[in-house]
Amino acid sequence: ANSNDDISLLYFTSGTTGEPKMVAHDFTYPLGHIITASYWHNLDEDSLHLTLADTGWGKAVWGKLYGQWIAGANVFVYDFEKFEPVDVLRMIHDYGITSFCAPPTVFRFLIREDMSKYNLSTLRYCTIAGEALNPSVYEEWLRLTGIKLMEGFGQTETTLTVATYPWLEPKPGSM
């Protein structure tokens, strides 16, 4: 790159309100995700973070890599062809995942499993994005794990825009 405003990567919007549009991000874009990782995901150098997001989705880099590495966290990357809830529970159990981010639908499927089969004691923080959170999913996850689901909102065009940070009390379904 010759300058910070050179194009670093291109993503396409989901096309929710029309045709997908190309979004260019420059080389300063990863810096915006220091907030994502350090405050929303609540990561530090002792963290092992897992985000479930397809690499074609902007969330893949802003939820898995940029801020997380800048914050010094360890990143667990899992590539799968088909989502299986037991695989996620097994990964948390086997690898000691400490921080986990996924769309609310993932948590809806996880709470349907027999979670008592897995030691999830290393998991200390969970974040969600990508769709609305059903308050009943929040309550059941909290009951089963003791962990609050912290919502966040961002877009392909931006970084994390608004979130429930560790010092805030969640209001399930408010985003």
Model-predicted segments: where are they?
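Short beta-strand->loop structural element characteristic of the AMP-binding/adenylate-forming
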Residues: 21-24, 74-81, 150
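Short Gly/Pro-enriched turn/cap motifs at secondary-structure boundaries
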Residues: 2, 173-175
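Gly/Ser/Thr-rich phosphate-binding loop
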Residues: 70, 97-101, 111-172
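Conserved S/T- and glycine-rich ATP-binding loop of Class I adenylate-forming
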Residues: 7, 13-16, 49, 92, ...
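Conserved AMP-binding/adenylation subdomain of ANL enzymes
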Residues: 31-48, 52-98, 113
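Alpha-helix/helix-capping structural signal
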Residues: 28, 105-108, 131-132
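Conserved pre-ATP/AMP-binding loop-to-beta segment of ANL
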Residues: 1-12, 19, 42-48
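Conserved AMP-binding A3 loop
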Residues: 8-32
